[in-house]
């Protein structure tokens, strides 16, 4: 007997929408359209990372993947390495990163990265910089999803915001010049549909970044994911005219270790949903990251948001295309992280050509 696949929306209706974990909430009333000017791919929500990279040769390319120790981060690293890329994989501990990297067929290097600790972020970035090589692909994949039953604050900032956004904000800043030296650098920010299903109605609450007022874990997670999308939007704007692109994406609902901090009911919701076919496998969940990072169709696409391997525009009051909010987020993030950031100048032609020679000879 063939089991019929239950789509995510039908599953939520059948369950009475009882599962309220971020990113699982039904999107009834949300209108999404294909983004104009971006080539459509033939891939969809059932495509896997191996399928979307079939025939793509990444030999000589350097990729950095944060959160490589499990889930879609591990699968992303595995597939990129399989296609020939040299992958630097990060984990919260060096032992975990080393174990993940050693189990992958291909060239990898493990580095420790704790996104909630900016000193760790700087140390990780400096270790990668010391490799003295261009970076072709930088995938900001690591993330945090809290239990939702209380505010956790780190250095005066709510944990979702500091781990999911600010940590990567510093990380990208410290590695940006290495992407300038690549033939065509790509920054991929793994966000979530929670950016428009769970974020505060007014968008990012800049006056409550410590979560002290009316804290709700789901809203805090959604706010951090909206920050990911706006980070990609602003990066795309600031990098216009360069060879670097930046895009964000929703990987899908996947039963991975990101739910380890949820209560048992919510963890059960993730497991049941994926087992019934309402979610994605890890192989499918890594597909959009790998597609955005490698597709020849997207060489000049920047500042866009992707779902199921295609760029989409979310209509309505989602704030995902709010350029003023994106600019303010950049300014606030810069102020909060000022002591850990470095200033950049765009490399001149001699610098750039030297970087290209190093990239091609690597």
Language model features by range: what are they?
Residues 298-362:
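C-terminal tail/cap regions
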Residues 1-19:
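N-terminal secretory signal peptides and thylakoid transit peptides that target proteins
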Residues 121, 224, 273-313, 323-328:
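C-terminal helical subdomain
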Residues 17, 34-257, 266, 338-350, ...:
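Rossmann-fold NAD(P)H-dependent dehydrogenase/reductase core
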Residues 30, 131, 295-298, 340:
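Generic structural signal for alpha-helix termini and adjacent loop/cap motifs
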Residues 6, 92, 116, 279-287:
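Residue-level signal for the nucleotide or nucleotide-sugar donor/cofactor binding architecture
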């Amino acid at each position: 007997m063939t089991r019929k696949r239950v789509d995510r929306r039908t599953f939520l209706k059948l369950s009475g929408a009882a599962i309220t974990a971020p990113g699982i909430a039904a999107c009834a009333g949300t209108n999404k359209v294909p983004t104009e000017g971006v080539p459509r791919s033939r891939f969809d929500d059932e495509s896997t990372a191996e399928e979307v990279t079939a025939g793509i040769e990444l030999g000589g390319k350097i990729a950095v993947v944060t959160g490589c120790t499990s889930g879609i981060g591990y699968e992303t690293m595995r597939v990129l390495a399989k296609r020939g890329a040299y992958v630097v994989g990060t984990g919260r501990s060096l032992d975990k990163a080393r174990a993940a990297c050693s189990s992958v067929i291909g060239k990898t290097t493990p580095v420790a990265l704790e996104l909630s600790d900016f000193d760790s972020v700087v140390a990780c970035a400096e270790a990668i910089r010391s490799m003295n090589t261009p970076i072709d692909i930088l995938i900001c994949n690591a993330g945090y999803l809290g239990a939702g039953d209380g505010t956790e604050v780190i250095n005066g900032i709510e944990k979702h915001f500091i781990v999911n956004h600010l940590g990567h904000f510093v990380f990208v800043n410290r590695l940006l010049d290495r992407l300038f030296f690549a033939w065509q650098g790509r920054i991929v920010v793994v966000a979530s549909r929670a950016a428009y299903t769970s974020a505060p109605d007014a968008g990012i609450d800049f006056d409550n970044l410590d979560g002290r007022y009316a804290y709700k874990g789901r809203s805090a997670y959604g706010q951090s994911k909206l920050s990911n999308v706006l980070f990609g939007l602003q990066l795309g704007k600031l990098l216009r005219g360069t060879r670097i692109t930046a895009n964000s994406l929703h990987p899908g609902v996947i039963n991975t270790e990101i739910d380890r901090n949820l209560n048992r009911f919510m963890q059960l919701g993730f497991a049941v949903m994926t087992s019934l076919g309402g979610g994605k496998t890890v192989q499918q969940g890594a597909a959009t990251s790998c597609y955005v990072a490698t597709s020849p169709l997207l060489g000049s696409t920047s500042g866009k948001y992707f779902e199921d391997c295609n760029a989409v525009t979310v209509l309505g009051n989602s704030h995902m295309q709010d350029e003023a909010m994106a600019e303010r987020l950049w300014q606030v993030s810069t102020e909060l992280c000022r002591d850990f950031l470095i200033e950049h100048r765009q490399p001149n032609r001699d610098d750039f050509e030297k970087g290209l020679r190093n990239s091609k000879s690597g």
